[in-house]
């Protein structure tokens, strides 16, 4: 998570390490976490994590999954359908927008409008403001390239959206 931080606290006879939500896997926008070398011995470890109990060995390769997503999106869009990618507002939305943008730019999927809403869009603005902290190779797609959807609870907004591929 952009802005995630950790702290190592040493008191006589005890060492505590606290970390916010982390991912050690390199992503498109963020490098994987890197903890300082001096964290070799910790008595108490506290980690805030969305998927802390998952086994990294069971995960698929990032590039492979990106291409699988592109393939699935291409099939849906070819049939004239729309693709909905619900994601967490903090971190995941920003990553997904950029994955889709890269798939479009590489020609794996056609250019269709992308929409972002709510908190995911607001967090994207923060990523844009602090883009110097992002992974150097992870070029953040300008937020202006995505469109505002409006009130997603208004049926007419959703109906209008789904009339053409997006």
Q: Whereabouts are the PLM-identified features?
A:
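Hard-cation-handling environments
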Residues: 69-166
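His/Asp/Glu-rich metal-coordinating catalytic cores
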Residues: 1-95, 99-108, 113
